[in-house]
Amino acid sequence: QLKSKNFYKKKHSKSILECKIRDWKPYDLQYWESYGISLPWLKFGEVYPISHTFITKDNKRYTFRAEKYAYAYVERKDGIVTLKIYQPKSTIRKWSNSGNASVWDLWCQLPKTGDKLFITSSRKDALCLWENTLIPAISMQGEGYIPKQSVIDELKSRFKNIYIFFDNDFDKDENHGRQYAQFLSKTFDIPYIEIPNEYKAKDPSDFVNKYGREKLKQLINELI
């Protein structure tokens, strides 16, 4: 039987998503470090390595062995645990999610007030930016989501300068990341920034993977 401290679950619709946490391995830390995120920040961001996922539906429980690189993102909106399972190298199921559009990644970790804040497209990018610039960062469930006006108003009351920092899909026929960023920027009167095309890196974590932490710090200073 799984111990509760190593076991998270969240009811979602008619199914329940659960996972079992395992110990961190050297290859896990190497993977995350390559994107500018260290173990202390993984712990801060409630990112956990996992060995199994479980789905209960119609009173039947299904067990799935997680891939080698498999992680759970935990969020605690209003005291309710939600899970997002991330398998970055999977060709079958990269994501599983028990949350909904109202759940923001890293919301619980935000300081009460601050000078600057990034709104990114993923927890990975948010943690990368936060660790390497010490500027708080959060993310929605994806770039295509539209936040509530009340949530944006709260963020504006807490942070003096907010920046939308979505993907620059420079290598796609349509740059959806830029389109979403421009839409939110216009809708909520928040400036947006992106990785310049010349770097051929779509987001902050990919940028660190290609150019390193120090180069990211330099770029952010130029962009804001």
Enumerate the predicted regions with their spans.
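Phosphate-handling DNA/RNA-contact segment within nucleic-acid enzymes
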Residues: T53-K160, H176
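Residue-level marker of alpha-helix boundaries and capping positions
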Residues: E18-I21, K116-L117, D171
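TOPRIM metal-binding catalytic domain and adjacent DNA-binding surface shared by DnaG-type primases
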Residues: Q1-G79, Q109-K112, I220-I224
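TOPRIM fold recognition
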Residues: G114-D115, K124-I224
